[in-house]
């Protein structure tokens, strides 16, 4: 498998950073005296040194379970590419797919909800065609990435089954604990401003209500987990909306992640390497987003 195909399957996620700006400094570079003499001495004075301390979880990728069949992984080429890139996170089961996903009964149909009364189970795909929780966690261990598991907060609200949704999330946490999977980071839904989320777009306040219904129960089960929220793909231009979210659910959110996809749907590996920062999706670049 070539890297262009890898790029088409895995999408980047930027999570966060901190900046440190020390005071001015002076650096002197000197060539060997025996070669060129004192005239070669160069002094460079800098008004400021800009240093950034970034999280080793800054860059991650999606595993879209409904689009990444098991056959994709058998050769080992894709797994090796992931190890070579060394992402901080591998996210599962995907983005918008997470708003439809029921981990105990994956159907392979990423944008359809098993809880929909009109859902036809005859359309389910064989489980050997897609990655399940155990296969995902095995991949995480082999690649050295941090697991990032999604919680479906949408289905319960859409179908008036909120408590069932919470119990589903708690069973997933218990399953991971019982299997020895150490999962610290959990993301809630995905970009619910988009209309293709399960139940359609929701306001920041409504998303906050969804988070509040789940997170206290999850942290009661495991107080050490970190909750990741994401109402919109970007943050810098949506501060007002995020203020609305924080007003409702800030006490239950530990991290906000932002999503930057280089040339969505068309990018190649070579284009990604050639354009840094890559900034054609949603206007700016990941660099300006986290600046």
Region roles according to the model:
Residues 23-188, 192-238, 247-255, 287:
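Non-catalytic accessory regions flanking glycosidase/transglycosidase catalytic cores in CAZymes
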Residues 1-5:
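Positively charged n-region of N-terminal signal peptides that target proteins for export
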Residues 8-19:
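Bacterial N-terminal signal peptides
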Residues 126-129, 263-291:
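Glycoside hydrolase catalytic-domain groove-lining segments
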Residues 258:
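Histidine-centered catalytic micro-motifs
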Residues 18, 248-249, 281:
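Hydrophobic, well-ordered secondary-structure scaffolds
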